[in-house]
Regions:
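Short, solvent-exposed loop/turn elements at beta->coil junctions and helix N-caps
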Residues: 86, 140-142, 204, 274-275
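Mid-sequence acidic-hydrophobic segments that form the walls
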Residues: 104-107, 120-131, 157-164, 179, ...
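CBM-like carbohydrate-recognition segments
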Residues: 20-45, 50-98, 104-120, 127-136, ...
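Fungal secretory targeting signals
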Residues: 1-19
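Extended ligand-binding clefts on enzyme/binding-domain cores
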Residues: 148-151, 155-293, 305-350, 360, ...
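Acidic interhelical loop/turn segments
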Residues: 132-141, 271-273
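Residue-level signal for alpha-helical transmembrane segments in multi-pass membrane proteins
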Residues: 12-15, 234, 377
């Protein structure tokens, strides 16, 4: 773990502290101590789900869990209106907060949270779709485009909602699986078992392959979002429906690709295409490493992956603690090394992805690290 304290102080003070305090509780508490705000964007949604899970990991009455519940509740008015939500604005990123609403609705039964989630679910019925039935990542900006990111943003919510309130809606379950099927058809490399960032069904984007419509590069966080989407959706998808076996196959296949592409130090490169590891500008990035660690450890715990993947996930987690967690000297810790963004609203080139700055305490990376830390602590 990195530290902002003098090097000589490490031997006497830092190691015992680390041994005594779980990283999930420590990082979650650090965000509370920093009075971190919330909005309905996907980044805060991931972070505050991580804080909520960290609290539940400790106790059903944990102050962390109560703090997260209060934050999420503050986004919804008494009549169930979600702050800033526009029912005519179609961006899959904006569906992600639905998971938080459902998490705390199950906990509290607060009807306003269900009402807000209902609005998101109904919006999915109206969502613009590709000719093959895939949700546009954003309308009208990304017409006919599907990104791996969007699967995590929307389909984990869609699956959770249907599991709670429409369990017998086979049409909905089939549509959820279809979103993964389309990504697999267009974005999977069957040699590396990794997936590129997204595809354009119309093949109009500057980056689109003229045959498949796929973008050219494997951006690690897009693959991380997709890996987490698979493991989280498999928690609620009915195992007796045909889609379950397909999703499980996609998950296991990606785990194989991750094992083979893991760097010797335990992390994953920002751009994961074979041969790019030594390319100047590429680097080991923290948020995706956390996402992969979480998915691998959770997959083993749930019996979906072979035991060998535990070592892969733990190696990644140990790297995160050693290289991307910093003690700040005031009782808090910070999570480092998260790339700020990656978008197909670009030329999708190596130079584009590697030009994006890194951030400290980024909500996306920190939330993913909380997920991974909980899994490591459950071992």
């Amino acid at each position: 773990m990195r530290t902002s304290l003098p090097i000589l102080a490490l031997t006497s003070s830092l190691a015992p502290t680390n041994a005594a305090r779980a990283y999930s509780e420590w990082l979650a508490s650090s965000f509370i101590d920093r009075q971190t705000p919330i909005d309905a964007g996907y980044g805060p949604a991931v972070l505050w789900e991580g804080i909520a899970r960290a609290g539940a990991h400790i106790s059903p009455t944990s102050p962390l869990l109560k703090a997260a519940e209060a934050k999420v509740s503050s986004l919804v008015s008494a009549d169930g209106t979600l702050d800033g939500w526009d029912p005519e604005w179609y961006s899959l990123d904006d569906i992600r907060i639905g998971n938080n609403l459902l998490y705390f609705y199950q906990r509290s039964g607060d009807a306003k949270l269900k009402t807000a989630a209902d609005g998101l679910r109904q919006q999915l019925n109206r969502w613009p779709r590709t000719p093959s039935g895939g949700f546009w990542h954003r309308a009208p900006i990304y017409e006919d485009q599907m990104w791996l990111d969007g699967i995590y943003m929307a389909d984990t919510f869609y699956a959770t909602y249907v599991s709670l309130f429409e369990r017998e809606n086979v049409t909905a379950w089939e549509e959820i699986a279809l979103q993964f099927d389309l990504i697999e058809e267009h974005c999977r490399n069957h040699t590396s078992n990794l997936l590129v960032h997204g595809y354009d069904e119309a093949k109009d984007a500057v980056w689109a392959d003229p045959v498949t419509g796929a973008s050219p590069l494997v951006w690690n966080r897009a693959a991380g979002w997709y890996f987490m989407a698979l493991i989280d959706t498999l928690q609620v998808y009915p195992s007796d429906l045909p889609g379950y076996a397909r999703l499980l196959g996609y998950f296991v296949t990606l785990a194989d690709g991750l094992e083979r592409s893991q760097d010797g130090g335990g992390g994953w490169w920002l751009i994961m295409n074979e041969g790019y590891e030594a390319r100047e500008g590429n680097y080991i990035e923290a948020s995706a490493t956390a996402m992969f660690s979480y998915g691998l450890l959770r997959g083993v715990r749930d019996g979906l992956l072979e035991e060998k993947y535990k070592a892969v996930g733990l190696k990644a987690y140990e790297l995160l603690v050693d290289e991307f967690v910093r003690e700040d000297g005031n009782g808090t810790i910070s999570f480092l090394g998260t790339v700020q963004v990656g978008s197909l609203n670009s030329n999708a080139s190596f130079e584009y992805y590697t030009s994006i700055p890194l951030a400290e305490n980024d909500a996306r990376g920190s939330g993913a690290f909380l997920f991974a830390a909980i899994e490591e602590e459950l071992l």
